[in-house]
Amino acid sequence: MDTDFWLQRWQDGQTGFHQDEVMPLLQKHWPALQLPAHARVLVPLCGKTLDLHWLAAQGHRVLGVEISPLAVTQFFDDAGLQPQRHTSRAGEHCIAGPIEIICGDAFTLDASVLGDCTAVYDRAALVALPAALRQRYLETVYARLPAGCRGLLITLDYPQAEKAGPPFSVDAAEVHALFGTQWKVQELEHRDILDQEPRFRADGVTALSTGVYRLQRD
């Protein structure tokens, strides 16, 4: 993962990927996971997403992971929260109520951190990684999640040659190839969103869809 790239994006305020509302697809499809309210939910590469607050409001314990200290600070400042802080090998832990964000590299997390995460919400992580890093991401993050872990994965699918990521295109075939050996994959929704994303159209992208997948580890 190109840490310097993401740190610079946050420093320069180039955060067009941040949404000022909770992701509607999260609200629509999260119930399909049928999780108990107290489940601990991993949100890798979380930025300062408002989705963390929504997940906490469902009764979950939320564990975000974010490389940018600025993003972590902005998340808590925007919510008027004063997190408690401590450090570990994983990074700096910032905790306020049911929400914890580790400011560190998701690729370095081990089972001691991830072992009790019974759910994962991946809207911005897999699509942020170039193809060469995605298998490693599965092997270093998803592989350390416990058996029975359930997840909601949201992807983008567009002709990669028409636009340089991130976010990158990850089509249904790649999702099944990446997860298929250790995870059950169920496609919940796949729809065209090009008209809703003028930045992609302005970049010359001719087709754009989003995919939503329910994951469950064997």
From Swiss-Prot:
S-adenosyl-L-methionine binds at W10, L45, E66, R123. GO terms for molecular function: thiopurine S-methyltransferase activity. It comes from the Bacteria. It catalyses: S-adenosyl-L-methionine + a thiopurine = S-adenosyl-L-homocysteine + a thiopurine S-methylether. PROSITE patterns: SAM_MT_TPMT. It is found in: Cytoplasm. The keyword Cell membrane does not apply. Pfam families: TPMT. Belongs to the class I-like SAM-binding methyltransferase superfamily. TPMT family. HAMAP family: Thiopur_methtran. This is Thiopurine S-methyltransferase. It comes from Xanthomonas campestris pv. campestris (strain ATCC 33913 / DSM 3586 / NCPPB 528 / LMG 568 / P 25).
